[in-house]
Every structure is written in C-alpha cells, then in structure tokens.
Regions:
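GHKL-family ATPase ATP-binding module
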Residues: 1-268
Length: 268
C-alpha cells in the first residue's frame, strides 16, 4: 500500500504555490484557488491573471527597473504549434528566459528556445542596420548583447511533444523552432517599427553591452600577453609593446638602470 511506502505525506505549501501561480500565468484567465486547512496553517490564495505571460514577465521584473513600459507580446500558430512569447528588458546585466511546452517547464531549453533566440538576433540586427543605429564599421549585435537584461517567457503548445536529454527537460520537435522563429520575427519586426523609441532604447543597450564585452576582451588579451612575457624568463629590461599589429611592434635593448624609461618614451 502507498501508506507503507510513504509513512508521512507532507505537502510543501511554498512549492505548491509557486507551481500553481506559474500555471495561472501560463493560462490566462484561469483561476486557481490554493487552500491550506492544516491546523495552525490555515490560509487561502487565489491566482488569476488576465494578462497571462505578459503579467508573468512583469512579476519577474518587479524588483528591477524596466527600460520601457509595455511588455512585448507575440502570439500565433504555425504548423500546428501555438506560440506565445512575452519579453521586456530591464536595467540589469543578466538574462532571465524561461521556456515551457504544454505548461511544462523545459529548464534545458530546446528547439522553441533556439527559434526565439534566432528570431531575436536576426530581427534586432535588421532593424538596427535599416535605421542606421549601428555604424558601418561596427560588428553586428550578438545574441548575448541583445539579451542582456532581458526577461522573457516562451510558451508553446504541441500535440505530440518530444523531449530529449537524460532528464527529458529539453524540447526536440523541429517544427517548434520554425514556428517560434516565424511568429517572433514577424510580430517583433512590426512592434519595433511601431515603437521606434523602445527599439532605439533596446539597440542602445545592446550596443553598450557589445562595447563593454569588446573592451573586456581587449583587457583580458593584454593581461594574457603580459603574463606570457613575464613568465618567459626574459630579462626585466625587455619591455613588451602594447600594439597588436606585428608590423608596429619593436624591441629595445638598453644599458643602464634608468635607460629603459627614456628609451620607451622615445617610441612613436
């Protein structure tokens, strides 16, 4: 009997509350009532969200400052896959993206998440280039730069979901990628065209992230360069160059304790 295996059945109210709230967010207008009748722990909570996953994003962003007021929302159906996506950037540097299939969380992502990220990167780069928000000599925005400070919910409904991985927490349906990519690309493009101020705000944040990442890379390369030189056993009077172009690099061999400083000052 079950009672022989599970000697004591204890329900964790906080775990139940989190999951039921999540389900209410994922199914707009669904009303869920959670009641605890255990002596000394009596309480009741109702979960009902008319805005669905748009309110989910606002809930996740409540402790942060959103960069724009309205949550971006995309909805549609392609090839039998129903797609819902909500997103909003905040002033943080971290990405918080959560994906679901038939209201089941997919912690390892999968094809629906891949489709979303591809659409996001493609659409923002197209918009930035068309509206000259990115200079001709600047590299395209990376997905990582665009997703900095992004909170997003990706929810798809599929009749026969296929899960991959040892823990079955990753969606494998190939049609989900195309469906999400198509719906998000089309509707996000329209949103950006209709909301140029929001579009510019997101692109500017992405460009800052790109420049910060590039500056960090250069600083890291410089440290590694110095580390290699200092660990090579070369004499201290051998000063490394700071230019990455080999044609502009040179080595000065100098005599005396103070000559190194004046020699380096004479470099062009």
């Amino acid at each position: 009997a079950a009672s022989d295996v599970y000697k004591r059945q204890v329900y964790d109210y906080d775990v139940l509350r989190q999951r039921l709230r999540e389900m209410a967010f994922l199914t707009k207008n669904l009303r869920i009532i959670l009641t605890d009748k255990r002596p000394g722990q009596e309480r009741t909570e109702t979960f009902h969200y008319e805005g669905g996953i748009k309110e989910f994003v606002q809930y996740l962003n409540k402790s942060k400052e959103a960069l724009y007021e309205n949550v971006i929302y995309c909805e549609g159906e392609r090839d039998g896959v129903y797609v819902e996506v909500a997103m909003q950037h905040n002033d943080s540097y971290n990405e918080s993206t959560f994906s679901f299939v038939n209201n089941i969380t997919t912690p390892e992502g999968g094809t629906h998440l891949a489709g979303f990220r591809n659409a996001l990167t493609k659409t923002f780069n197209s918009y930035a280039k068309a509206n000259k928000l990115v200079k001709e000599n600047e590299a395209a925005l990376s997905g990582e730069d665009i997703r900095e400070g992004l909170t997003a919910i990706i929810s798809v409904k599929i009749s026969e979901p296929q899960f991959e991985g040892q823990t079955k927490q990753k969606l494998g349906n190939s049609e989900a990628r195309g469906a999400v990519d198509s719906v998000v690309s089309e509707q996000l493009t329209y949103f950006l065209e209709q909301n140029p101020t929001v579009a510019k705000t997101i692109c500017e944040k992405s460009l800052l992230a790109q420049r910060a990442r590039e500056a960090a890379r250069k600083a890291r390369d410089l440290v590694q360069r110095k580390t290699v030189l200092s660990g090579s056993g070369l004499p201290g009077k051998l000063a490394d160059c700071s230019d990455n172009d080999p044609a502009k690099c040179e080595i000065f061999l100098v005599e005396g304790d103070s000559a190194g400083g004046t020699a380096k000052q004479g470099r062009d």
